[in-house]
């Protein structure tokens, strides 16, 4: 092949590449123009304001007006340089050099996402974040090419119309800062009793780091996470040359509580609604991608205000339950068994009215639900998969080791009943038959069955026959009152599992609306659900759940008690009597399912004596209120 031929081939290839390149640019440009043609118009009023969201109960009565609580806007000349440096350090290093979009950041994020297989994440400038907060959903599923194009287009437009100082001011006044505070000046006054200009570098660094996850980095509810985030901001400030090494060392060694004052209540709603509203906020964001704290909307929920108020009264007075002390905690969830509507939920006793959307133990999975796991992990799968054919099947309560080990399984009383019926094993909450049943079912089948009831483990073990303990308890894995109430609802509802639903309708600011409901999915055969209910009726009438029994009300349920390890008892508990870290009761009627957890915030503070009866009594008091004027009747096949 001569030199001229090679040159012709090279020229041909170059022309082809150039043609493809030009075509790609034209196609991309056309697609970009199509996307941005549907972008909303820039509006200073929207950049400045945060419209409040109104929340209604299941009778369409207003229960909260969120977003209207506190707002003190900072003027541009009131914003300290250290705050600006902190914000750009953690959010947008090249903020003062780009014009709305950062091509270097886009290329870096693209390479990271290609390596990690992720979506269009990590490339947003501070200007784009402001646009997103003002106009768009923050849901990961909504980070589409169309949305990204519109976001970039509006960011470039905003940079042409506003100065960098104005954009920063919009952002500083726009962001949600937890506990009902909107804008960093509002947070400064609420948390420190000072204006922004009077705060120290570590205090400003904390505020600068909060907007990405304001409730998670709340220094009152999550001081450790807040300190970690603050220190990351300080590290970035040092790396960018905004503070010296000496200033950095001094700042990171400043306690996160330095200067914090007691919170004053800013809530426009009663304290008994706080936990429920937190879950409403989360579900709205899961379903729509919008944060109702920064996006105006009307949300219609499933909470029954009267039931929620009664649950609060049961927790916080001695009129219904005699508590052993003020420190014993309770967390519970009540769902409608037919559609999963959460009609009431409360995560603690004696909650502070000064904290908004704090930890809600009712949805946390960090405590062990003990023997309440037996119906859903062991016995229901055994009936479903034909391991046992009736409630009268014989099981063995005799010396037995966890499969594949030399570790014995003990019953709570360290004794054995011999051959007993399946019903009696569940009624008396015997551990040995439960673990042996799980072995017969098989771990894989049990895990699949649990998944159908909304419960999962990173990996399931034979110990999970009588425990919900898991290596990861981040609400995804393990059990909570929310998860257990919904799981047991499937027994009450003929085997149909309903997803817990807090919201039923949203009306957006543009007048459009969306309804939310869950028709449920079949988790087990109707016969399985009926046999499980038949067995668990005897738990209340004759077994471990007699404290929840109401002779006039057809209901079923299961008690649960977790255990300390021998090491914990020897080194920490040092109590020779019967003690436990957690006591639970999960029960249901044909209409409602309720799960109750009791225990101390410090797990090493044991439940003793009468404390073991609190969970059943809370359930009994609530079910009496729910059913005495609305008798749900009995189950039939």
From Swiss-Prot:
Pfam families xref list: Transgly (PF00912), Transpeptidase (PF00905)
Region (Transpeptidase): 298-612
Top-rank taxon, per record: Bacteria
Active site: 91 (proton donor), 371 (acyl-ester intermediate)
Reactions listed under catalytic activity: [GlcNAc-(1->4)-Mur2Ac(oyl-L-Ala-gamma-D-Glu-L-Lys-D-Ala-D-Ala)](n)-di-trans,octa-cis-undecaprenyl diphosphate + beta-D-GlcNAc-(1->4)-Mur2Ac(oyl-L-Ala-gamma-D-Glu-L-Lys-D-Ala-D-Ala)-di-trans,octa-cis-undecaprenyl diphosphate = [GlcNAc-(1->4)-Mur2Ac(oyl-L-Ala-gamma-D-Glu-L-Lys-D-Ala-D-Ala)](n+1)-di-trans,octa-cis-undecaprenyl diphosphate + di-trans,octa-cis-undecaprenyl diphosphate + H(+); Preferential cleavage: (Ac)2-L-Lys-D-Ala-|-D-Ala. Also transpeptidation of peptidyl-alanyl moieties that are N-acyl substituents of D-alanine
Function in brief: Cell wall formation.
The protein's name: Penicillin-binding protein 1A
Organism of origin: Streptococcus oralis
């Amino acid at each position: 092949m001569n030199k001229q031929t090679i040159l012709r081939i090279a020229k041909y290839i170059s022309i082809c590449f150039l043609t493809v390149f030009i075509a790609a640019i034209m196609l991309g440009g056309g697609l970009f123009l199509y996307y941005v043609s549907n972008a909303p118009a820039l509006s200073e009023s929207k950049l400045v304001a945060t419209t409040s969201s109104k929340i209604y109960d299941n009778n369409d009565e207003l229960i909260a007006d969120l977003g209207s609580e506190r707002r003190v806007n900072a003027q541009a000349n009131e914003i300290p340089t250290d705050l600006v440096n902190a914000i750009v350090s953690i959010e947008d290093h090249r903020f003062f050099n780009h014009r709305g979009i950062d091509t270097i950041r886009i290329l870096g994020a693209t390479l990271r996402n290609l390596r990690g297989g992720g979506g269009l994440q990590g490339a947003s400038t501070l200007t784009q974040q402001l646009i997103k907060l003002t106009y768009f959903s923050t849901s990961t599923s909504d980070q589409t090419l169309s949305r990204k194009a519109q976001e970039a287009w509006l960011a470039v437009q905003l940079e042409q119309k506003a100065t960098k100082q104005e954009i920063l001011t919009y952002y500083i006044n726009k962001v949600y800062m937890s506990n009902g505070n909107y804008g960093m000046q509002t947070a400064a006054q609420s948390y420190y009793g000072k204006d922004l200009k009077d705060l120290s570098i570590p205090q400003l660094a904390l505020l600068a780091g909060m907007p990405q996850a304001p409730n998670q980095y709340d220094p009152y509810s999550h001081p450790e996470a807040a300190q970690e985030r603050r220190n990351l901001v300080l590290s970035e400030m040092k790396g960018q040359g905004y503070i010296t090494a000496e200033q950095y060392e001094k700042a990171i060694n400043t306690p996160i509580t330095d200067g914090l004052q007691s919170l004053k209540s800013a809530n426009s709603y009663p304290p008994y609604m706080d936990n429920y509203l937190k879950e409403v906020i989360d579900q709205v964001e899961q379903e729509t991608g919008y944060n109702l704290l920064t996006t105006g909307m009307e949300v219609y929920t499933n909470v029954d205000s009267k039931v929620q108020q009664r649950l609060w009264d049961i927790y916080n007075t001695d009129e219904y339950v005699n508590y052993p002390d003020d420190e014993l905690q309770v967390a519970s969830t009540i769902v409608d068994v037919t559609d999963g509507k959460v009609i009431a939920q409360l995560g603690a006793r004696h909650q502070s009215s000064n904290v908004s959307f704090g930890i809600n133990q009712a949805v946390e999975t960090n405590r062990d639900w003990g023997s309440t796991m037996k119906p859903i992990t062991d016995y229901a799968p055994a009936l479903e998969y034909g391991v046992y054919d009736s409630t009268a099947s014989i099981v063995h309560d005799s010396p037995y080791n966890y499969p594949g080990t030399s570790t014995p399984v003990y019953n709570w009383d360290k004794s054995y009943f011999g051959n007993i019926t399946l019903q009696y094993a569940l009624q008396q909450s015997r551990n040995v038959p439960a673990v042996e049943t799980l072995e017969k079912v098989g771990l894989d089948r049990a895990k699949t069955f649990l998944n159908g009831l909304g419960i999962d483990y990173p990996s399931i073990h034979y110990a999970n026959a009588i425990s919900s303990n898991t290596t990861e308890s981040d609400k995804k894995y393990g059990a909570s009152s929310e998860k257990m109430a919904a799981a047991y609802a499937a027994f009450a509802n003929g085997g149909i599992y309903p997803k817990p639903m807090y919201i039923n309708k949203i009306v957006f600011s543009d007048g459009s609306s969306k309804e939310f409901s869950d028709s449920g999915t079949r988790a087990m055969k109707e016969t399985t659900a009926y046999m499980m209910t038949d067995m668990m009726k005897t738990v209340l009438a004759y077994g471990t759940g007699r404290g929840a029994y109401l002779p006039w009300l057809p209901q079923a349920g299961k008690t649960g008690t977790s255990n300390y390890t021998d090491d914990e008892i020897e080194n920490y508990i040092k109590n020779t009597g019967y003690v436990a870290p957690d006591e639970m009761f999960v029960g249901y009627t044909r209409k409602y399912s309720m799960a109750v957890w009791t225990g101390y915030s410090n797990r090493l503070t044991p439940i003793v004596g009468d404390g073991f009866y609190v969970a059943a009594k809370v359930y009994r008091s609530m079910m009496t209120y729910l059913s005495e004027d609305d008798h749900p009747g009995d189950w039939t096949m």
